[in-house]
Amino acid sequence: MKFSEMTYTRPDIDALLARCKQLAAKAADAPDGDALIQVYYEQSRAFADYATASQLANIHYTCDTRDAYWKAEQDFFDANGPAVTNASVEISRAFLANPYVDALTEHFGTTCVAGMKNAVLGMDDRTVELQQEFNALVSQYQQIYGGALVELDGKQLTIPQLGPYKEDLDPAVRRAAYEAEAGYFDAHRDELDALYTKIVKNLNQQAKVLGYKDYSELSYVRMNRIGYGQAEIQAFRDQVARDVVPELQKVMAMRAKRTGITHPTFTDLPIIFKDGNPKPIPGYQARMDAARTMYHELSPETAEFIDFMQDNELFDVESRPGKMSGGYMTSLPSYKAPFIFANWNNTSGDVDVLTHECGHAFEGYLAERDPNVPADLECPAMESAEIHSMAMEFLTAPWHHLLFGKDTEKYALLHAEDSFVFLAYGCAVDEFQHIMYQNPDLTPDQRNAEWLKLEKKYRPWIDFDNLPFYGRGAGWQRQLHIYECPFYYIDYCLSTMAALQFFLLSLDDHKDAWERYLKLVRRAGLASYTELLQTAGLKVPFEEGSVKGIAQQMTRWLEEHQVG
């Protein structure tokens, strides 16, 4: 069914909550392990219509944040979502209280029961009002960001549409683009500062209600991190600061030499090549045709997947006024249909987001069609889900010539370099959030000072050159995740460590790398992060020394593939 034909009906929340009570009673009373497993499948199906309606509303709202109807529907889910989540938690509580609960682990693997324990520990009726308030705060942030229109080049442009200007070979044009963006954020400075203060206060209050010290502690439960905690994440960040940052300084020196920009400032960083960055082929249909060819040749599974996505018009990827920034993949369970949202702006990032979100969507497509995988275990925790997307970016490389033509080698260098360099920024975002939630009384200026310290620690090559907004340390405010889904961002770093390993493997044997990837993807949400890495024969980045070897191999590859 085409996306435009999918019908939306606002769900009956009271009926759903009553159904949840029945399911909780069934879970509590299941007389043996087999019965408990069947109830688990049943409860997992029970949320399909609600989840589909919720995601349809969110898709339509993010496609046009100015549409009053979809804004009202989004508000409805913001207000009612916490009650549904908590009803789901009560079902989990009933499963955990059943004496046959171990049957779920035996049948589904390690993540099922551990995930329910995290759900129970992370949610409570006492936090419903606070959750509703948090949802409303996020919607306010999305409206500020999604409503951004700035004046440049005689045009009114959205933030994503500034992308090509930020990559212009004329430094004055780049500076003007960054200043236009900075002007918008500076104009909303007080609102953004106040919103973040409220978000930190709200989430820390939720944590205290649930018996945690602060939200940095609760976030590990809410993010469903299984088998590791703050100590392991800090050990990983320490390895990045110690073993990756020195390698990245070599990489940035290579970039400066390549571009001929002797003393690059922040607005020079998007320039990767002297004669301009790689540009994908123009035209929506041309790109979609190239993607279809690429996925048809990659594997039979991806061929079936891309036909389904394109034939059912499950992409909205072109930027326009009122559309929310960023990109995402979501799922419409009643239709077994993934959906991909993006904001193309005629930069190489258009291909990044296409292959990235297709990685998520491909995993969702397979999991939704596996009868052994319950709906709520179709997707693993986010640090694992991002492996699907980030590895896909690399594993499609043999077909990138279809999307880049003569710029293919430049894109290969740019993509590998950007993915490697990203580790430093991702760790800075994560450490920043730990500091914010552990020190909630910091003033806005103190928050910005902490951000600038982390920039020096993780990205010592950056010179902001008195750029408004960024120069005062407020650049973190344009990172959607910091407001919308705190502590998510490190997941990109953990998955990057897996994706870089898939990249290095694919250089030796692409077929072997793809088969390992497919094996990992097919485990859906039935395995933890470390188990998934072991499934594919990859190194676990928490282990001392695991990061250094990968970093050195990446630097060597980049040294050998300098072009432009």
Predicted regions and their residues:
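Post-HExxH zinc-binding segment in Zn-dependent metallohydrolases
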Residues: R242-D243, E368, C379-D407, A416, ...
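Active-site recognition of the HExxH zinc-binding catalytic motif
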Residues: A342-E368, S389-M390, F394, F432, ...
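Glycine- and acidic
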Residues: G122-M123, E179-H188, Y228-Q234, L269-P280, ...
